């Protein structure tokens, strides 16, 4: 199944983050949002995005587990990790699994827009 060229998936259990992405990018991109890792994997399978902003700490299936499954299944999607807690070993592991960037919360809107524009243009 082909991905939509401007589709972004945002995965975060914080509704405020999801709302921020909607305000920031909703008028320019096809945003799909979810608050859990299991739903994220289902969306990636059925409505493949080109870019995923993925929170690390979530109940159930966390962001690192989602990233590991994506790589195991050889899904070709760009992933940007977003997190409130920075640990160098987590960043290294995420990047070794193919994450293209690692952003700290609170998110820098200029950086989010730059990444979306760079990947989706």
Please identify what each model-predicted range represents.
Residues 65, 86-101, 114:
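Alpha4 helix (beta4-alpha4-beta5 surface) of REC/receiver domains from two-component response regulators
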Residues 82-84:
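Hydrophobic/aromatic residues positioned on beta-strands within the core alpha/beta folds
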Residues 35-39, 62-65:
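Acidic catalytic/metal-coordinating carboxylates
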Residues 105:
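A Lys-centered signature of the CheY-like receiver
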Residues 42, 64-74:
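Short amphipathic alpha-helix used as the core "switch/output" element in two-component signaling
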Residues 15-32:
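Two-component/phosphorelay signaling modules centered on CheY-like receiver
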Residues 58:
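Receiver (REC) domain active-site loop signature in two-component systems and cognate sites
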Residues 47-53:
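Active-site beta3 strand of CheY-like receiver
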């Amino acid at each position: 199944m082909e991905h939509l060229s401007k589709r972004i998936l945002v995965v975060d259990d914080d509704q405020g983050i999801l709302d921020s992405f909607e305000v920031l990018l909703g008028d320019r991109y096809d945003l799909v949002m979810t608050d859990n890792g299991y739903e994220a994997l289902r969306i990636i399978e059925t409505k493949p995005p080109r870019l995923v902003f993925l929170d690390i700490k979530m109940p159930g299936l966390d962001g690192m587990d989602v990233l590991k499954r994506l790589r195991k299944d050889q899904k070709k999607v760009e992933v940007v990790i977003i997190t409130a807690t920075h640990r160098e070993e987590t960043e290294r592991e995420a990047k070794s699994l193919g994450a293209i960037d690692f952003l700290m919360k609170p998110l820098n809107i200029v950086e989010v827009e730059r990444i979306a524009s760079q990947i989706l243009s």
